[in-house]
Amino acid sequence: QMHGGIISALLDSAMTHCLFHRNVEGVTAELTVKYLKPVPQEADLRLSAWVEQKILTLYKLKAELSVGGEVLVKAESKFMEIRKQS
């Protein structure tokens, strides 16, 4: 089984890249991970992440890790946007 800390890091990274895709730089302010079933080490993983809500500089995101179409882990997070200084 895959270690929970690695799974958490993968989901956090997927959500971060979801923001990068929108040209938003942000930092994780809060992360909640729900482990529904064990994740096999040798499995082909599918990570999905999306923005649920944006309030000023706060982004709420969700992500899922699935194997063979079955969701094994879910995550929710809040990211704070980093404003670039000119």
Where are these regions (language model features)?
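Conserved beta-strand segments that form the floor/walls of ligand-binding pockets within enzyme
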Residues: 1, 28-34, 46, 60, ...
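Hot-dog-fold acyl-thioester-processing enzymes
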Residues: 1-18
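Surface-exposed loop/turn and secondary-structure junction residues enriched for glycine/proline
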Residues: 4-5, 9, 30, 42, ...
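Residue-identity detector for glycine
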Residues: 4-5, 26, 68-69
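Hydrophobic beta-strand-centered segment that forms part of the acyl-chain substrate-binding groove
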Residues: 13-46, 51
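HotDog/MaoC-like acyl-thioester-processing domains
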Residues: 39-41, 52-86
